[in-house]
Amino acid sequence: MSDRQIKGILGTKLGMTQVFDDQNRVVPVTVVQAGPNVVTQIRTPEKDGYSAVQLAFGAIDPRKVNKPRTGHFTKAGVTPRRHVVELRTADAGEYEVGQEVTAEVFEAGTVVDVVGTSKGKGFAGTMKRHGFRGQGASHGTQAVHRKPGSIGGCATPGRVFKGMRMSGRMGSDRVTTQNLKVHRVEGESGLLLIKGAIPGPKGGLVLVKSPAKGGA
């Protein structure tokens, strides 16, 4: 079992803006409405085989919550929430069920990973989806300007290889942007100003957590 202490919080992406640092340099930041989250369950090695903390976020009409999940929130002594995430962390025992987690779990200068769902683009061709060059614009090319070209041989190998890059649905994928720096924490308003861009549209759900690799 890992002995790493992982911090994290669910929030909503509000959009991007720019602020100034101490040297009056422009810093592009993404504003995240972080939390408040509430602890709904503590996992322990003795009972569950691993150590983790479960966080819940977002209001939801109780009538839209099924009975098993309603019972789970009732047991924790909190009102039902829309989103739930579990973080494996060695210090899960320091949390308490019902405890509130706010943006102040992070400090300015902290390096974080941000997990979100990328914007859905719908069905896209190979030029947009994979950056293919396409066919010639002239010299006898007819009605195939944006087509991918050959996808394999004929008798040999007699099939299309797995993983062939082709047209299909693009976007709406789970994306993690690693090692972003928290530029500022607005404790009273629950805002995190994270340097750089993060995945997803405005209003999208994001998870801000301790970095999986590196970080300072």
Curated annotation (Swiss-Prot):
GO molecular function, one term: rRNA binding
Transmembrane segment boundaries: none
Gene Ontology biological process terms, A to Z: translation
UniProt xrefs under Pfam families: Ribosomal_L3
UniProt-annotated stretches for the region Disordered: 132-157
Gene3D superfamilies, A to Z: 3.30.160.810, Translation factors
SUPFAM superfamilies named in the record: Translation proteins
Keywords: Ribonucleoprotein, Ribosomal protein, RNA-binding, rRNA-binding
Record bears the keyword Coiled coil: no
GO cellular component, one term: cytosolic large ribosomal subunit
Keyword tRNA processing attached: no
Function of the protein: One of the primary rRNA binding proteins, it binds directly near the 3'-end of the 23S rRNA, where it nucleates assembly of the 50S subunit.
PANTHER family: 50S RIBOSOMAL PROTEIN L3 (PTHR11229), LARGE RIBOSOMAL SUBUNIT PROTEIN UL3C (PTHR11229:SF16)
Quaternary structure and interacting proteins, as annotated: Part of the 50S ribosomal subunit. Forms a cluster with proteins L14 and L19.
NCBIfam families listed in its UniProt record: L3_bact
Family membership noted in the UniProt record: Belongs to the universal ribosomal protein uL3 family.
Name of the featured protein: Large ribosomal subunit protein uL3
Organism: Saccharopolyspora erythraea (strain ATCC 11635 / DSM 40517 / JCM 4748 / NBRC 13426 / NCIMB 8594 / NRRL 2338)
Name of encoding gene: rplC
